[in-house]
Amino acid sequence: MSKVLIIGCGGVASVAIHKCCQVPEVFTEICIASRTKAKCDKLAAELAPTTTTKITTAQVDADKVEEVIALIKAYQPDLVMNIALPYQDLTIMDACLACGVNYMDTANYEPENTDDPAWRAIYEKRCKEAGFSAYFDYSWQWAYAKKFEEAGLTALLGSGFDPGVTQAYCAYAKKHEFDTIDTIDILDCNGGDHGYAFATNFNPEINLREVSAPGSYWENGHWVEIPAMSIKREYDFDKVGQKDMYLLHHEEIESLAKNIPEAKRIRFFMTFGQSYLDHMRCLEDVGMLSTTPINFNGQEIVPIQFLKALLPDPASLGPRTKGKTNIGCIFTGKKDGKEKTYYIYNVCDHQECYKEVGSQAISYTTGVPAMCGALMLLTGKWTTKGVHTVEEFDPDPYLDALDKYGLPRSESHSPALVVD
């Protein structure tokens, strides 16, 4: 029996909340909190007849730590699930520390204003020291490790699919399939079609910033950075087919390089259609992906935030998206002195997700792991104090929960490898 405060009410949060309500014996009470309380009220009203979980709602501006502290003190939760924006990770972590409550999220911290001088100085130092230039990285949240450990609290970082399940797949491979892992390729394929000329499947601002940034991968103990979308490969995905995929920087590479140090190379690939890439490059060329505020008719606006307002809401894509996703990890390494390959992945159907929770599969594949991560913390399966990513915990109960609640794994011991 647990009380959980869930901050966020977008597409991913909606899925996570639906799934929490399917496990009322653990999620006895939940409070849905967002800047827009009306969205929380609407979702609570929809779910109330379907669950015995007691649902309340609240308004909170998660950019303001004092508001989050006040809400936590008023509600007294056992866990705070941060399913808002990565910009708000640190304020919510600060609030959890102030109130003595465990914390979890689905994506690592990045700043909303990348021109802030104080942040910029630290960022530029990290670029030189680490060797990659992505705006998002774990260093900001890892810096909280001692504080959470001394407070006897756990902060679980990145319990979505990628990051999240992909790291659990790596921990599973290390525990059950390999003595040593040599290479890891993380493949994220969305074979869905929503019918729009251009739309993003999750928060447009976060998505477009991620894919327009330089790519990078880990090789032989250091980062290799490349121009955005400059490495392209083809792969034949189970239940989806042949797709073009591009090497991106992705946050789990950073933690996997730390926690599976014998890995000689770790890469992340994501599929994109040509129409998406053409639109993205055009928008970038005209400055619409910029995060720098501009003055327009006497009002300050951020171009990428204005673009977000024009694009379809990812939460609205569910009824019109058809097809499947396929996300997983391909490994090479050794077991009992012999060379070995292994592929573990999940295939998820957009329309089946919509039938169950009114969502497309991108939100579903992030929201279900968020609930399963919370389940691990609330049931005592994962108890290590401090700040940790998913691969640092026992993967078995987490993957079993994913199998049970909608994201079953598939395996191959003779997969096609990604061409070097």
What are these regions (language model features)?
Residues 175-420:
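C-terminal catalytic/substrate-binding lobe primarily of soluble NAD(P)-dependent oxidoreductases
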Residues 61-77, 88:
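Conserved Rossmann-fold cofactor-binding substructure of NAD(P)-dependent oxidoreductases
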Residues 9-10:
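Glycine-rich Rossmann-fold phosphate-binding loop(s) that bind the pyrophosphate
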